Amino acid sequence: MMNLIMKENLNNAVEQVLHVKGNYAGGILEMTLVIDCGLTKAYVAETAADLAATLRSHSEVFRNVRLNLVLFKCDERLENQVISFSFLQMSSCFEEYQEQQGKRTLDALSANLKLFHARSKLILVLAGESLTMEDPQKVHENMAPFLGKKSLFLFQGAINGSWLRGDAVERLLAQREEL
């Protein structure tokens, strides 16, 4: 469950992304939510519902949203579906969710987002600790110039519940690989 600090961090991070020059100019917001299927069903359902409730209570922008849900099962299998924000808030979209093992890299995720979700003005990623990066150059090419600025990652177990922008995650995973 998201505590008050995590909710405030989410609201602040989303405001920063939406107010990047040239990103969101009003109207219907198109956004993407990526779920790492290595996470437990209980965590995903609860966090996604909290996320939707927090955003909806924060701003009128989230009253009418085109929401793309991406289930990141493994590098070779990413499932896309369009759902309503209310459906996410009630966690109904996770009734058939199954936790899955498999290799998940930022390489595959960033390539998929660049191809299919570049129009989204906001990309939220619920990620597990097992997310890795194989080719930093390829990830950088996929994240630049826009994906890195409009994507926010929340890693399960993040101590302060802070959301990291995509370009910061890219640097973090590169440092982790060097160790």
Please provide the spans of the model-predicted regions.
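Mature extracellular/periplasmic domains of secretome proteins
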Residues: 139-146
